[in-house]
Regions:
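Signature aromatic-anchored transmembrane alpha helix within multi-pass, membrane-resident enzymes
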Residues: 34-42, 158, 215, 236, ...
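Interfacial juxtamembrane loops and adjacent helix segments
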Residues: 58, 73, 77-118, 122-125, ...
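Multi-pass, polyprenyl lipid-linked donor-dependent membrane glycosyltransferases
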Residues: 67, 135-141, 161-169, 173-193, ...
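Membrane-embedded, lumen/periplasm-facing catalytic core of multi-pass transferases
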Residues: 426-479
Length: 551
């Protein structure tokens, strides 16, 4: 296309000799320029996504629908204040309850159970105040823009407009990308930028782009070490299939990226747990399910918890998860159908490239299988939704799965097949957008309304709780944490023991449970055995004051 435009520029005339309007010619050049397509596609997605994040959460959110987001935000605030990701534990805590969910008590303080890179980076950014908070919101938006632009670079110039559909076609990944306080969001942002840099390497041949792609993957792997082995294997296989002659440079860059990811976590593990090879999440798993036998190879237990944190599911569990999250979750079946495009794409490659890419596809399938479990949020529900845990774990797979149908359409020369495939991809993208904006309990509209509602409720509840008091709650820590000290309710007997110990230490205690669940009723019964009662403070909201009755 660029050649056609430049040939017209030399004479200033069109094909029949008439003078060409200079303004029209400049417009034609701009409209056909591949670089302009990249900028346009990226700018549109960046503006849409940044607006969505700011509309949903605001610039400095403290109310979240998920405790995972609250963990990262809380730890970031502590780091911003210079005290590290630690909460003081005022009492012995054998039940491991004197902290919010997804934290763990280590001695006289508690720390998050997540890999530390995400909340350390967030904490350092929040030290920049408004600028840092804007960057946290803008980074995932930039990732979406980079993914769309990277897809465009993989497409022929005449069909780069197809890249406009790529983020929406991977709608579960888009949903989790735009929840910036989830620790999956920086991983997906890193993958998106890696796709852009990798595509730039393939288009320009400059090895610096490959180094940048693997640096991005190294950051993503540092944020989520449980994805690291899969990310590096995929990067190695895709890169070797694309340019086998550069195998030495590829191996070296992948190894350097792995060292970068590993070093960051080893250093922060030592700061948090005191042991470089002992991560907080591994300690939490050991405490919940029992420690694994000692291994002669240091770090082997941690490696297993990273590769297969939940083991391999049974056929019944795996098939049910496949039905929910690959067949019936909105228009997701169209994304699965689009993988048929892998067949013609692979047939065009050399035998060596087909073997390497086939191995990469097998690794992606194994990864997806290892994350399909019913002992997760949404596992007990008969339907699939993007806000469930399994789609969150599978977001890198959804992201990469959006590429084959678009790459096939970019190369397809059959007019009817191109039109039919284009209609299916447009339907997938449109259906995905509808899921993200209209689906109950998972749309950005729902998240926006939740933040507004709970922010108002937080102001009202916080006025009824004295400063310094602790509040036991089963699930409401995700929006209470910023105004009150929150501890958690789990097993009723153990929670009653913890409350009794804290009450005997003369601490001012409250229980917050909006609904009288079976767990709450059992807790009341256990407290009664210990001469502890709950006095209603705000019956409408479920706030109770703990009262230690005289014997």
């Amino acid at each position: 296309m660029e050649a056609e435009v430049s040939s017209g520029e030399g004479s200033g005339e069109n094909a029949i000799g008439a003078p060409v309007n200079p303004a029209r010619r400049r417009f034609a050049v701009a409209s056909l320029s591949p670089t302009v397509w990249l900028l346009l596609i990226g700018a549109v997605w960046f503006a849409v996504c940044l607006s969505t994040v700011l509309w949903t959460y605001g610039l400095d959110p403290f109310v979240f629908v998920s405790s995972d987001e609250a963990v990262v935000r809380y730890a970031a605030r502590l780091i911003e204040k210079g005290q590290g990701p630690f909460l003081n534990v005022p009492l012995p805590d054998p039940e491991d309850l004197l902290h919010p969910r997804s934290w763990i008590t280590l001695g006289d303080r508690a720390t998050p159970t997540y890999a530390p890179v995400s909340f350390y980076v967030a904490g350092w950014l929040t030290r920049l105040h408004g600028l840092g908070l804007l960057l946290i919101a803008a980074l995932p938006a930039s990732g979406v823009a980079a993914f769309a632009a990277g897809t465009a670079r993989l497409l022929p110039p005449r069909r780069r407009w197809l890249a406009m559909l790529s983020p929406a076609a991977a709608f579960p990944a888009l949903y989790w990308l735009l929840r910036p306080w989830m620790n999956i969001s920086p991983l997906l942002t890193a993958i998106c930028w890696a796709v852009f840099c990798w595509a730039s390497w393939r288009e320009t041949g400059r090895r610096g782009w490959l180094a940048a792609a693997l640096f991005c993957l190294g950051y993503g792997a540092a944020v989520r070490p449980d994805y690291a082995a899969y990310l590096f294997l995929l990067a190695l296989l895709f890169s070797l299939a694309a340019s086998p002659g550069e195998w030495k440079a590829i191996l070296g860059l992948v190894a350097a990226s792995g060292v970068l990811a590993l070093s960051a976590n080893l250093l922060l593990n030592r700061v948090i747990t005191g042991h470089a090879l002992k991560a907080a999440y591994q300690m939490s798993i050991d405490r919940t399910f029992g420690a694994e036998p000692e291994h002669t190879i240091p770090g082997l237990g941690m490696l297993r918890s990273l590769l297969l944190p939940m083991g391999i599911p049974s056929w019944a569990i795996g098939s049910e998860a496949f039905r929910k999250y690959w067949l019936t979750m909105g228009p997701i079946a169209l994304l699965l159908l689009g993988q048929v495009a892998l067949v013609p794409l692979l047939l065009k490659r050399s035998r060596q490239a087909r073997l390497l890419l086939g191995a990469a596809i097998a690794i992606l399938a194994f990864f997806a299988l290892s994350r399909m479990h019913d002992d997760l949020f949404g596992g007990a529900m008969h339907y699939g939704s993007v806000h469930h845990s399994v789609p969150r774990y599978l977001t890198p797979v959804y992201l990469l799965a959006s590429l084959p149908p678009l790459l096939f359409l970019g190369q397809c020369k059959n007019r009817l097949l191109t039109i039919g495939g284009g209609v299916l991809v447009v339907a997938l993208a449109a259906g995905g957008c509808a899921q993200l904006w209209r689906e109950p309990n998972s749309s950005f509209t729902f998240l926006h309304d939740f933040v507004l509602k709970k922010s108002a409720e937080l102001e009202r509840i916080a006025q009824k709780i004295p400063e310094g008091a602790a509040v036991y709650t089963a699930k409401e820590d995700k929006w209470l944490w910023s105004r009150v000290k929150v501890w958690i309710i789990e097993d009723p007997t153990q929670t009653a023991q913890s409350i009794e110990r804290a009450a005997q230490a003369k601490l001012e205690l409250y229980v917050f449970e909006p609904s009288r669940t079976k767990q709450f009723r059992q807790l009341v019964a256990e407290l009664s055995k210990r001469n502890i009662s709950l006095a209603k403070v705000d019956p409408r909201s479920g706030l109770y004051r703990v009262k230690l009755d005289s014997r």
